[in-house]
Amino acid sequence: MKNKDVNYFKLQAKNLYRDYQTKQPYIDDVDGQTYYQYSPKYFDIDQLFVDYDWDEENFSLMKAQHLIANMVGFNKWADLLKAQPEELELAHLLLDNQEKIHLEDWNMYIARIEYDNRVVLDPASKLEIFKKVFLEEEGHHSPFPPYKLSQK
């Protein structure tokens, strides 16, 4: 399962970089500054660059990998590659279910469980909670739009 999940994240990083490569410069009529517009297929790249404060001028595949890792709760790509299988599966589910819960809300949800119960949850427990609460139960909707565009 680990290789499958790592390959999934590699593909997501490639897709994010492909979306970045659709950039077209334009000059704003009001301020005369050059900005970029994108024709993304996989990710809401404009929102990602704003939320994560990334430099549009110097984006690369390596930076796309780092950004994907950040989007699913890892500090860097290397941390994602070294993650336990349960952590990778949870990260995969978090990325694919952003319309149900945003990463920050998930982290707060888990922190509250740990605080209320005076425990530190292991990755397998977090994965089990995610599956039971956000996959098996209907009605969860994040107030934030997902970064990943729906593929129709």
PLM features: residue spans?
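Long, non-globular segments of proteins
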Residues: 1-152
